[in-house]
Structures are given as C-alpha cells and as structure tokens.
Amino acid sequence: MRGKWLFLVAALTAAAIGCGQGRAIFDIDVFSFLRATNADTLPYVGPLPPGVPDTIPVQTIKSLGIGSSSIVDTVRVFGTVDFVNTSGTGTVTFQVYFDTAKSAVYTGTPAFSVNGAVTPGVTTTSPFDIPDLPTALKPLFLASTVYVGIRVSTTGTISGTAKLTALRARIVIQDKFF
C-alpha cells in the first residue's frame, strides 16, 4: 500500500512539473472584437485637415480577468495591416494603444506601431510580430476589460485607408508563489 501511495505522489509531482511550471497561455483574437464593431478600418489623410479624426472610438475587449494573483510573463502581439492608398506617396504609421481606463487610452505611449510606405493605387501589406510588449503594459492584460485604440499618422500628401486584417495577443501568465 505504501508503495502505491509513493508511486501516486511521484506521478502527481511529475505531472505538476510537466504542466509548464505554473504557466497558462491565452490567445485572444483582438481583431474579432474590432471587426465586430467596424473599428478595424481607419481612413488616413495627410496632412490631416482640422476636424478629421485620426483615431477610432475606443473599443472594449474582454480579457482574462485574473486579477493580481498572477504575473504576466509575456504579451506577444502579431497580425497584419493593409494600407490601401488612393493618392500620393508617403508613409503611414498605424499605432495601437491599450489601457484599463477608457479615458486614458490615447494619453500614453502606443503599445506598438506599424509603418508602411505607400504609393498611389497600391495596397501595402505590413505584417507585424511584437515578441513582447513593454513591461509597464503587461499587467493590463490581467484585468477583465482592456480598452483598445488605433491611431494613424502620415508623412506626405496622401490619402487612403488603413485596414487591420489580423491582430492576436498571446499572453503567458505565471502564478505568484510568494
């Protein structure tokens, strides 16, 4: 009986060690939330005339809602932006913002930026893969709600549309053991 008990304890210990050292991995399709509200597309004009917005309305993404009992180890974001240029030659910068306070989304530094050189009548596809967001942004993804904003800026006299075609966040969480 004692041998079976020791075997069971050893098997459970091995299983626990093999589970990734207390890590959980979550994959959030941020694009699906943005597409559902038609916030995946943003026109751009350069130079920007007065009164023309360069941002989408802030969008709500349901996140993990784990709270402070865990630590975010890694937040990898990847996807693709298409710059559908109708006129002019220049560069478009597509910036993505995250925050847990809706009113603060556009007040900070963007989480990441994607650039694309554009020419008239051509769609420029710009894939991106950000291996890990800045440390200051990682705790945001433990909240139950994360707000997302998108801004475009341009150089040159150009016009067109920036269309997000994919945006995923892969979040690696580690339990706190202290």
Q: Predicted regions span which residues?
A:
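Bacterial lipoprotein signal-peptidase II cleavage site
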Residues: 20-26
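A short beta-strand element within beta-rich, extracytoplasmic domains
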Residues: 70-88, 165-169
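Cysteine-clustered segments with highest specificity for TGF-beta superfamily mature ligands
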Residues: 117-165
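Short beta-strands within extracellular/lumenal beta-sheet-rich domains
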Residues: 46-69
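Solvent-exposed serine/threonine-rich low-complexity stretches and specific carbohydrate-binding patches
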Residues: 107-120
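Sec-dependent bacterial lipoprotein signal peptides
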Residues: 1-19
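Post-signal peptide N-terminal segment of mature Sec-exported envelope proteins
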Residues: 27-50
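Short, surface-exposed beta-strand/strand-loop-strand elements in extracellular ectodomains
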Residues: 87-105
